[in-house]
């Protein structure tokens, strides 16, 4: 089995355009992946096209780790969210093909089932909205994002609305310097925040 085509599909949406990847093989099996990056979808699509030509087409799609390494190490410069998003989209599609080839869900190829149910959370910016989502619609928790200086007041309002039997999360989208993010996390701790997503940008070590 060999990869014969890698094609991207750009789906226009309101807030963010979605970029999907379709990998086709000579046996007719196809796999799908998703590689959306807000406002950078055309750059990711171009990167996918380059990766496909250099490292994917003609390869056995079941050699997923080999293809991943070739995509990652193909040039002198590597990394960055454009490159890694492109790799991710293709990688997902290859795993999709593998699952279809072996006739098992992909999670079985990754080690099997860990749990038989999942929590489901959504986004809220006010206490009233959070209460409705958690206690009337049944979500297990809510995630919020506030600029520096406003987060603690928002967390207090939301925690009082949903109580401590529901989970609370924060996402800063990597927009703050490390020192300010540290302040935010200290302020969030008293409200039982379960996780603090992207406190700094991916390039900040």
What annotation goes with each model-predicted range?
Residues 1-32, 36-37:
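Structured beta-strand/loop patches that form or line metal/cofactor-binding pockets in enzymes
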Residues 50, 89, 96-97, 108, ...:
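Alpha-helical scaffold segments in soluble metabolic enzymes
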Residues 16, 43, 47, 59-62, ...:
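Conserved active-site and cofactor/substrate-binding residues in soluble primary-metabolism enzymes
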Residues 5, 11-13, 58, 92, ...:
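Generic structural "secondary-structure junction" signal
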Residues 91-123:
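Glycine-rich, aromatic-flanked loop segments that form ligand/cofactor-binding clefts
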């Amino acid at each position: 089995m060999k990869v014969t085509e890698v094609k991207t599909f750009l789906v226009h949406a309101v807030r963010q355009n979605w970029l999907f990847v379709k990998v086709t093989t000579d046996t007719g099996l196809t796999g799908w992946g998703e590689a959306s990056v807000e406002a950078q979808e055309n750059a990711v699509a171009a990167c996918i096209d380059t990766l496909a030509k250099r490292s994917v087409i003609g390869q056995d799609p079941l050699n997923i780790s080999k293809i991943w390494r070739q995509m990652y190490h193909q040039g002198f410069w590597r990394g960055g969210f454009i490159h890694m998003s492109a790799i991710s989209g293709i990688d997902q599609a290859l795993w999709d093909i593998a699952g279809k080839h072996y006739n098992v869900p992909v999670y079985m190829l990754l080690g099997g089932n860990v749990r038989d149910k999942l929590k489901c959370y959504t986004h809220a910016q006010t206490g009233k909205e959070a209460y409705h989502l958690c206690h009337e619609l049944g979500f297990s928790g809510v995630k919020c994002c506030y600029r520096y200086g406003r987060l603690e007041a928002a967390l207090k309002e939301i925690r009082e609305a949903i109580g401590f039997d529901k989970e609370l999360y924060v996402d800063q989208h990597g927009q703050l310097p490390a020192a300010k993010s540290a302040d935010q996390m200290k302020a969030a701790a008293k409200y039982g925040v379960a996780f603090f997503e992207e406190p700094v940008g991916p390039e900040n070590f």
